[in-house]
From Swiss-Prot:
Involved in mRNA degradation. Catalyzes the phosphorolysis of single-stranded polyribonucleotides processively in the 3'- to 5'-direction. Mg(2+) binds at residues 495, 501. Belongs to the polyribonucleotide nucleotidyltransferase family. It comes from Synechococcus sp. (strain CC9902). Gene3D superfamilies: GHMP Kinase, N-terminal domain (3.30.230.70), K Homology domain, type 1 (3.30.1370.10), Nucleic acid-binding proteins (2.40.50.140). It catalyses: RNA(n+1) + phosphate = RNA(n) + a ribonucleoside 5'-diphosphate. Residues 700-721 are annotated as: Disordered. GO terms for cellular component: cytosol. Its cofactor is Mg(2+). The lineage of its organism: Bacteria, Bacillati, Cyanobacteriota, Cyanophyceae, Synechococcales. HAMAP family: PNPase (MF_01595). This is Polyribonucleotide nucleotidyltransferase. Keywords: Cytoplasm, Magnesium, Metal-binding, Nucleotidyltransferase, RNA-binding, Transferase. It holds the Pfam family S1. Residues 562-621 form the KH domain.
Length: 721
């Protein structure tokens, strides 16, 4: 198995590219290695299916737990469906690749990245993105690459290129930028309320680094003697497009310029124009070229009409500065926000509406045991904040089967989750696990940013003490040559017919999340900077409207939310609280009707719907873990009696024993002659033996009731008070 390995020196590290050794039947394959991380990426092309009018591209990212020396924890001990983070990596590969394929391509394309080995110092996702470009070029697929991706972190005041997992966790920025020689094609970022200028600088820093990887790919192709296949659009028959442009331009423009009409009226108006065109074509002579072309292809008329509508709408924006709903380029749609729209049995709820986009978000508070365990390669195995996004078909007036969440739903949910994470309270001050669910009730663009706004409303209604409220806006772009217009708060038709979908979320202080997808082959960082800066006043305007609904987190939780008490104990005493076989902690939970979680760090969290019960459980645990010293005095009750002595509960959950010889100064024949179960006594700690057992005494300790001294002729002793 011969192969060729080439090395790239990149930011002080060595990236190794091995070609010709693995997956010989794939169209193109490359093993990308850095440190001990190794990702095999393949690209394969097969003949397209009939009737396809889109690019059938599939990007998969496969994780194997053997890459980290682990065996899956499932019953079958085999990897099941891809975990959420693997799905997000699939999208991370797909988003910069898709705009670089020619729009006319209809062949089935599949890119598969498999993580074979993982070094925690070198995350695999950006290697997979760069590897996807290399494999595609090696496969000879028409592609406007090379393309590469890097991650940028921020530690203190310094940008870090391709940081480790630990550095990502510690830093204030986690930004992935992908680009070509022409410009940026994809950005994905989470930030700790960073100013716009810092984020733009980070994008520029990453884009400059990408150029080295692009040059390395060009060198690789040259060394292998492979010529890149550049997309060349096939000649299209312009008969139908030319006919529609002549017959329908005026009618379409009239519909698009009715700024006061509703989305439904505009859609119906365009459908009517298309129907008239179809009727006119059907009335043409049978040998007419237009009629014959439409008859030979069921989708030709629809696609040509859609292309003409796109062209006219873009011209209206570029020339007149007017959008289909009459807004200016930097104008936000009408905003409506409400908090507490559902009964308090739902811990928190918020309803956010922007134009025809409406999102209902709910917040649920849970206990530490409700945290999501992540069985994947990522070193962070637990999630304390979860956001789930649902997009039912009725939100766009359609019918289709309701199935489990797809990649889009998972991706949108993760973006809204990322936007909120930086403003969540610290675990020590608010130990709840929080789940937010965003139900998209109506969609006309920017539902993910609507979910961010809805999440903020729901969390504040639930009483979660956010560091700052967060809002979001989606920006768009229309580009024809050097003529560029940036659109604020794009709606569905502008997203579909535009060149960019750029989502920006953040607080008044700065950005918390960023996501940019392009439909063109690259955008200069300078234009991106304009979009980021134009998004800020839009975000703040939306935030102002949200704060009119609820200006701060509620001071009290829902009566149906669990009450949590959190405190710290010595980690070495965790075993004392748990007890042999878990008997001690089980007894505490049964006695107090609470739920108790103990972390390895010693943080104890008690959950209960009754605050008094939680406090009782806390006292018991504190008693179990409190250090007892010789000579200390305690008051407690007799819990049990054995022939050689009596046990006293000196602290909640902690007992000591009074030996029969320590019950009195006089000789005692029978323990019951002095005390019985339930008696309240004051004792002194006589000693703590080498096994940690607490030995107590009554001798010389004044009691609050009758004397414990035994008369020469023993008589029954009254209970001690």
């Amino acid at each position: 198995m011969q192969g060729k390995t080439q090395s790239i020196s990149f930011d002080g590290r060595e990236i190794r590219l091995t070609t010709g050794r693995f997956a010989p039947q794939a169209g193109g394959s490359v093993l990308v290695e850095c440190g001990d991380t190794a990702v095999l990426v393949t690209a394969t092309r097969s003949k397209g299916r009939d009737g396809i009018d889109f690019l059938p591209l599939i990007c998969d990212y496969e994780e194997r737990l053997y890459a980290a020396g682990r065996i899956p924890g499932s019953y079958m001990r085999r990897e099941a469906r891809p975990p959420e983070r693997a799905t997000l990596t699939c999208r991370l590969i797909d988003r910069p690749m898709r705009p670089l394929f020619p729009s006319w391509m209809r062949d089935d394309l599949q890119v598969v990245a498999t993580c074979l080995s993982l070094d925690e110092r070198v995350p695999s996702d950006v290697l997979a993105v760069t590897g996807a470009s290399i494999a595609t070029l090696l496969a000879g697929i028409p592609f406007n690459g090379p393309m590469a991706a890097v991650r940028v972190g921020l530690l203190g005041d310094d940008f870090v290129l391709n940081p480790s997992y630990r550095e990502i966790e510690r830093g204030d920025l986690d930004l992935v930028v992908a680009g070509t020689a022409d410009g940026v094609v994809m950005v994905e970022a989470g930030a700790n309320q960073l100013p716009e200028g810092d984020v733009i600088e980070a994008i520029d820093f990453g884009y400059e680094a990408i150029q080295e990887l692009i040059k390395a790919q060009e060198t690789l192709l040259k060394d292998l003697g492979i010529k890149q296949v550049k997309p060349e659009a096939p000649k299209e028959d312009t008969t139908v497009p030319a006919y529609l442009e002549k017959q329908c331009t005026k009618a379409i423009s009239a519909v698009l310029s009715k700024f006061e009409q509703s989305k439904e009226d505009r859609d119906n108006g365009l459908e009517a124009v298309k129907a008239d065109a179809a009727e006119a074509i059907a009335a043409l002579k049978e040998d007419d070229a237009v009629r014959q072309a439409v008859s030979s292809s069921s989708k030709l008329l629809g696609n040509s009409f859609k292309a003409l509508t796109k062209k006219l709408m873009r011209q209206q924006i570029l020339k007149d500065g007017k959008r289909v709903d009459g807004r200016g380029l930097d104008e936000v749609r009408q905003i409506s926000a409400m908090a507490g729209v559902l009964p308090r049995r739902v811990h928190g709820s918020g309803l956010f509406q922007r134009g025809l986009t409406q999102v209902l978000s709910t917040a649920t508070l849970g206990t530490p045991s409700d945290a999501q365990e992540m069985d994947d390669l990522h070193p962070n195995t637990e999630k304390l904040y979860l956001h789930h996004y649902n997009f039912p078909p009725y939100s766009v007036g359609e019918t289709r089967p309701m199935r489990s969440p797809g990649r889009r739903e998972i991706g949108h949910g993760a973006l809204a989750e990322r936007a909120i994470l930086p403003v969540l309270p610290e675990k020590d001050t608010f130990p709840y696990v929080v789940r937010v669910v965003s139900e998209v009730l109506s969609s006309n663009g920017s539902t993910s940013m609507g979910s961010v706004c809805g999440s903020t409303l729901a969390l504040m209604d639930a009483g979660v003490p956010l560091k700052a409220p967060v809002s979001g806006a989606a920006m768009g772009l229309i580009k024809e040559g050097k003529d560029i217009k940036i659109l604020t708060d794009i709606q569905g038709i502008e997203d579909f017919l535009g060149d960019m979908d750029f989502k920006v979320a953040g607080s008044e202080k700065g950005i918390t999340a960023l996501q940019m997808d392009m439909k063109i082959t690259g955008l200069p960082v300078k234009v991106m900077a304009e979009a980021v800066n134009q998004a800020r006043p839009a975000r703040l305007h939306i935030l102002e409207k949200m704060l009119e609904a609820i200006d701060k987190p509620r001071e009290t939780l829902s009566p149906h939310a669990p009450r949590l008490l959190s405190f710290r104990i010595d980690p070495e005493l965790i075993g004392t609280v748990i007890g042999p076989g878990g008997r001690t902690i089980k007894g505490i939970t049964e006695r107090t009707n609470t739920k108790i979680d103990i972390e390895d760090s010693g943080i104890v969290t008690i959950a209960s719907h009754d605050g008094a019960a939680a406090e009782e459980a806390q006292k018991i645990i504190e008693g179990l873990t409190r250090k007892v010293n010789e000579g200390e005095m305690f008051s407690g009750s007799i819990t049990r009696i054995i022939p050689i002595g009596a046990f006293v509960e000196i602290l909640p959950g902690k007992e000591g024993m009074i030996h029969i010889s320590q019950l009195s100064e006089a000789r005692v024949e029978k323990v019951e002659d002095v005390v019985k179960v339930g008696d309240e006594v004051t004792v002194r700690v006589r000693e703590i033996d080498n096994r940690g057992r607490i030995n107590l005494t009554l001798r010389g300790v004044p009691q609050s009731g009758e004397s414990t001294e035994v008369e020469p002729q023993p008589t029954p002793v009254a209970p001690l008070s």
